[in-house]
A protein has these predicted regions:
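Residue-level signature of mid-helix packing/kink "hotspots" within the transmembrane helices
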Residues: 29, 57-65, 116, 150-151, ...
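Extracytoplasmic
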Residues: 12-46, 235-240, 364
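Conserved MFS/SLC helix-loop-helix module at the cytosolic interface between two early adjacent transmembrane helices
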Residues: 62-102
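Cytoplasmic helix-loop-helix junction between adjacent transmembrane helices
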Residues: 107-146
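Structural signature of the two symmetry-related core transmembrane helices
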Residues: 78-93, 286-305
Length: 407
């Protein structure tokens, strides 16, 4: 069958990668929603729920650097196909393994491992295929697609049986693999000339692992990413449970968990266009990255601080939605900063950053369960802790970030 050619090469890459991120993000949202009815069936304790939710992050943590390495050695196309196929299989078989807590946790680890390969591979692809003047938009569309995936899953899953959620979204991944084969531009890495004119050519120099670890500008990015993910993981993992158990939500109310992701996707696209617009108005890249990161970390911190004292469910959803929306500004902030400071190694720096930023995903499950249990079912310490982490991340990024090439 003839390959599809009705989009430009860059557009096809962005569209395909965004579709992969849609499925990636949708699959990871299913369990936080499904765990509410599953707990009624399997009678899991709050701590057991915490470990089920955090098991994903254990796998995700281990595969970040591997994703970047394999993409450079084996080809981004091959790595991305394999990762989507593996995480789709893990999603599809989850209902069959749910009767065994151990088997379910292992399946969640495999899911996390496969999904962890995705974004570093995509960053590797973007770093070699997207011109500088289009990067903010490309990253914004990429991350917005993840929010759309989370939105779709959050809307549909409360109205499906818990096992059907896994079957449907697992099947989407199988469809994507076929689309990738027919739409992917084969010439994406065919020659050095495919690297955009406005992107630095690969520099032949010796890079040590210490260069990725000892750079203050890179640590500014790593810390900002960690801070962003701390609050994001709490919301992703625990918002359905919080609305259902603490604010008295029902199946209809759980559909409201889609609203934060809708707002996040809209803000993500808007922030990308705003950032590119500021660059066209001669703002420095550094000032744009700092502005977007400050809005993306300080804004959510303030709204989470208010969210934790509200007991009116619709108002609580409004507050957490604004928080998630402002968080999307990070896509044009520190997340885009990788290709500014390390254009030839953006896949590797993102892999390291995402590995560090996965630690909150490992901790948020058991730590949240322990805090809620210790404070007699109160969640205030959970959200105030996230507020503090966000504010510290914003301060460290603002005072240490650069936009010049360091690697």
């Amino acid at each position: 069958m003839a390959r599809i050619r009705w989009l430009t090469r860059t557009s096809r890459i962005v569209a395909l990668c965004s579709a992969a991120n849609f499925i990636n993000s949708a699959d990871r949202v299913i369990m936080p929603i499904a765990i509410v009815p599953m707990t009624d069936i399997f009678q899991w304790s709050l701590h057991a729920q915490g470990w089920i939710l955090s098991a994903f992050a254990f796998g995700y943590f281990t595969s970040q650097i591997l994703g970047s390495f394999w993409a450079s050695k084996l080809g981004a196309k091959n790595v991305l196909i394999c990762s989507v196929l593996l995480w789709s299989i893990a999603t599809f078989v989850t209902p069959f393994l749910a009767h065994s807590l151990t088997a379910l946790v292992i399946c969640r680890i495999v899911l996390g491992f496969a999904e962890g390969l995705g974004l570093p591979t995509i960053f590797h692809l973007f770093a070699h295929s997207i011109p500088v003047e289009e990067r903010s938009r490309a990253f914004s569309y990429l991350l917005a697609s993840g929010s759309v995936g989370q939105t779709v899953a959050s809307v549909l899953c409360p109205h499906l049986t818990w096992d059907a959620c896994f079957y449907w979204f697992g099947s989407f991944g199988f469809i994507w693999v076929s689309l990738w084969y027919f739409v992917y531009p084969e010439d994406a890495f065919s020659s050095e000339d495919t690297i955009p004119l406005h992107m630095p050519k690969v520099i032949s120099r010796s890079i040590r692992w210490a260069d990725f670890i000892l750079s203050k500008p890179l640590w500014a990015i790593y810390v900002a990413h960690f801070a962003m993910n701390w609050s994001s993981y709490i919301i992703m993992q625990w918002l359905p449970t919080y609305l259902a158990r603490y604010l008295g939500g029902n199946a209809h109310s759980l559909s409201l968990t889609s609203v934060p992701y809708i707002v996040n996707s809209i803000f993500g696209v808007i922030s990308g266009h705003v950032a590119d617009g500021l660059l066209l108005k001669n703002w420095s890249v550094l000032n744009v990255r700092r502005l977007m990161t400050s809005v993306g970390l300080v804004g959510p911190a303030l709204f989470l601080a208010i969210f934790c004292v509200v007991d009116h469910l619709p108002f609580a959803v409004v507050l957490v939605s604004i928080s998630m929306g402002l968080s999307a500004c990070n896509s044009a902030g520190h997340l885009s900063n990788h290709v500014d400071v390390a254009p030839n190694y953006a896949g590797t720096t993102f892999a390291i950053s995402n590995t560090i930023a996965t630690i909150p995903g490992i901790l948020c499950g058991p730590v949240t369960a322990s805090l809620v249990t210790a404070f007699d079912g109160k969640w205030m310490t959970v959200f105030l802790g996230a507020t503090f982490v966000n504010l510290m991340g914003a301060f460290i990024y603002f005072t240490n970030s650069v936009a010049t090439q360091v690697l």
